[in-house]
Every structure is written in structure tokens, then in C-alpha cells.
């Protein structure tokens, strides 16, 4: 029998992989998921900020607050 997947398990499987994080304001951050906590605060490495699908700037390390995140998906 297969155990149901939990959201934090899915994030744990995405650790050290590139993800797309979309915020409530519509901005997207793409980078390697380094860490997260139970509040879904996330740290991305080699992060890039995208606005309206266009690269706005390269950030490096970014901390994104969980209550601003709407979607996290693999790249």
C-alpha cells in the first residue's frame, strides 16, 4: 500500500533542485531550494526574480516568507 504524500514531503523531495516560487503579488522566483520550515518560509540559492515572465534581476540567496507564497513547483 502506498502512503499518501504530505506537502512537506514533496518539498523535501525538491530540496537541492530548481523550483519556481510564485508570490501573491505575481512575482516569481526561480532557484535551487536549499531549506524550508513548517511555515513554508523558503531559502533559494542562485535565485532570479521574474516579473510578467521576464527576468528582472539575479538575486543570489533569497529568503521568501511563507505567507506570501501561493505556489511552489519544480522547474
Predicted regions and their residues:
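Conserved RNA-binding domains used in RNP assembly and mRNA/RNA metabolism
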Residues: 1-75
Amino acid at each position: 500500500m502506498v502512503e499518501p504524500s504530505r506537502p512537506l514531503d514533496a518539498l523535501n523531495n525538491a530540496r537541492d533542485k530548481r523550483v519556481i516560487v510564485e508570490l501573491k503579488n505575481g512575482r516569481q522566483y526561480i532557484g535551487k531550494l536549499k531549506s524550508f520550515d513548517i511555515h513554508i518560509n523558503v531559502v533559494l540559492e542562485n535565485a532570479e526574480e521574474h516579473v510578467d515572465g521576464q527576468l528582472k534581476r539575479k538575486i543570489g540567496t533569497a529568503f521568501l516568507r511563507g505567507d506570501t507564497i501561493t505556489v511552489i513547483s519544480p522547474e
